[in-house]
Amino acid sequence: MSKDGMEMFGVLDLETSFEGCRFAIGIRNGNNKRFRLACTVGLRVFVCHNLAFRGDYSPVLAKHSKHFSLEDALSIGVDRMQRNFEPMRQQVEGWRAQQLSATAAKLTIYRAFIEADLEVPRHLARSVHELYFNPQHEEFQPRTMWSLSNAFTSAFKELDPIPQFRASAKLGKFLGAVPAS
């Protein structure tokens, strides 16, 4: 919830899981007309509780009115998001298999923060670097895109909830554009 109570971001953890991850639905809403109720598919990593999202938030086709049902809107949104489960699982498997050289990892971090290819606070660059090259969890020891993704999402935990959700929602697209090294 934003400080003024006009914007809300949240996560629904789902029962569907695979190899150390549980699917989740990211939800946002703005009563200040900044954005409509929208959902995106994501996942939560069991070992560290990191959140990662796939794609942008998709609006739920409903206007705020006295007849609006949040339960119905979320039901429709969850149904739509389930179509992204398999592509997201495949992306994770691809990232787990995608080896990164130290140079490629450093260049990706540089592009994210110094060249501002990822809209996130620059002060997180050092945290991402440290979390990738000195991982806190054994699962992230391999030098892969998956480990780098989790370094980013772990660093994002330093942010307040709303900026954390925004950063997490943009990360997948950014990392998806990184060429294999």
Question: How would you describe each model-predicted region?
Answer:
Residues 13-181:
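Intrinsically disordered, low-complexity regions enriched in serine/threonine
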Residues 1-2:
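Amphipathic alpha-helical segments
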